[in-house]
């Protein structure tokens, strides 16, 4: 059999590609909001009504929330800060690293450590921790200043993330507003306790680039406003 000749054709002037991103598909879509703002001139109110129809916006009182730090699941929590900080009332100097681990309910270890590769030495073995409203026990590190609205990174706590497959290797360091803690619930899980408004101040800039605000002669700011 002889292969058939290839059929030649002329490509169209416009090729439309339809698809979606990798998000959960619920609520506001950042790139969609940008398109409505820049290409259609929508205000942030119009964008919000499009994604959250039949709703009204209003002011709500700020409150504390606990945010699960999933990247640290079932791993020791390593915390440091440029300024002094405390763990359950125990003082640590700026630059020191504390390793927190949950052995079981009402049983936590607090070690001073040199980092991911160092198990450290015991500062408090078998700390009973505290009990939250759900009956789970936890311990918590707090910064020198409890004002979570500060922008000085030296005043914030920092999580040291170790490689899951090779725990002796440091992967990253990230600052957090508020306090950082370890909760025992059939395992050990890290959390960040912070005021909701301060949490949003840290999340929004990571989800949408600030450069969007200058797009479309400044119309992109409406997309950022909607996201915030």
Question: Where are each of the predicted segments found?
Answer:
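Conserved, single-site charged/polar hotspot
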Residues: 1-228
């Amino acid at each position: 059999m002889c292969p058939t000749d290839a059929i030649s054709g002329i490509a169209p002037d416009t090729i439309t590609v339809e698809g979606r991103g990798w998000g959960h598909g619920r609520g506001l879509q950042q790139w969609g909001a940008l398109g409505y703002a820049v290409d259609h001139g929508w205000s942030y109110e119009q964008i919000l009504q499009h994604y959250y129809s039949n709703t009204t916006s209003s002011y709500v009182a700020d409150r504390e929330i606990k945010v699960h730090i999933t990247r640290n699941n079932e791993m020791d929590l390593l915390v440091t800060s440029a300024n002094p900080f405390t763990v359950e009332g125990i003082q640590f100097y700026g630059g020191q690293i504390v390793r927190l681990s949950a052995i079981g309910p009402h049983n936590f270890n607090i070690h001073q450590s040199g980092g991911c590769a160092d198990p450290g030495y015991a500062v408090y073995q078998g700390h009973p921790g505290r009990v939250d409203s759900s009956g789970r026990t936890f311990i918590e590190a707090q910064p020198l200043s409890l004002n979570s609205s500060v922008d000085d990174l030296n005043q914030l706590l920092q999580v040291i993330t170790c490689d899951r497959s090779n725990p002796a290797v440091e992967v990253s360091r990230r600052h957090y507003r508020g306090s950082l803690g370890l909760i025992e619930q059939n395992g050990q899980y890290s959390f960040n306790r912070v005021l909701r408004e301060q949490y949003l101040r840290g999340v929004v800039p990571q989800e949408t680039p600030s450069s969007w605000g200058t797009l479309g002669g400044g119309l992109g700011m409406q997309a950022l406003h909607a996201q915030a």
